[in-house]
Structures are given as structure tokens and as C-alpha cells.
Amino acid sequence: METVYIVGAVRTAIGKYGGSLKTVPAHTLAAEVMKEAVKRAGIQPDIIDEVILGEVRQSTEASNIARSALLEAGFPETIPGFTVNRLCASSMQAVNSGCQEIWLGEADCIVAGGTE
């Protein structure tokens, strides 16, 4: 079994419901966080095998927020993205799914996290 490493963690500023970030779509915030995570990890986006993001509320702006965010971040369009909706445990499931892909030898580098 492959050893899995979490090489970085990034988050946005803490906002409040209906606050100053209310007009910023979740996929736009996620894109900024993903760009910063990749920068801090010292990797190039083209080595990413998949982006997995969890969310609680699916919006009509980005029905697959993982895919929308990775494209907005400027990552290669060859990278697949999938969205997990498991309510409060969505981001944990996204990280678990990424670990499983690495353990199974299906991926070497995953960007995983959550929104909201």
C-alpha cells in the first residue's frame, strides 16, 4: 500500500452567511485556494491526477464544483474533477476518496478539499 502524504492545507478567510463574500461564487473561492495550495506545495498543476471537492449545497452556477474550480484555477482541462455531496462530511469524504485512489495506485497526486 502506498504511503499517502498531505503536503499542505489552505483555507479562505472566515466569512459569515450573507457577509462580504456572499457575491463570490464558491467555485471562485475554491479556485483561489487550490492555486495557493499547489503553489505552497511547490508542484505544477500538470502532475495533478484529479481534483475532488466536497460541498453541502449544490448551486446551479457550478453543478460539478470540482471541475468548475479547477478550470477557473487555470489547471489543465485534462484533469478530471468530481464533487462529493455528503452534507457535513463532504470534505472529509473528498480527502478519503483521494487517499483511496493513491492507495490503490490509481493516482499519484490529488487535490482534495471542501467548500462552504
Per-region residue spans from a language model:
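Conserved "HGTGT" condensation-loop signature of ketosynthase/thiolase-family condensing enzymes
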Residues: 1-79, 115-116
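Short, conserved beta-strand segments within well-ordered enzyme catalytic domains
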Residues: 50-52, 83, 110
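Active-site nucleophile and cofactor-binding loops and adjacent substrate-binding regions
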Residues: 62, 81-90
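Active-site-proximal alpha-helical scaffold in enzymes
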Residues: 86-116
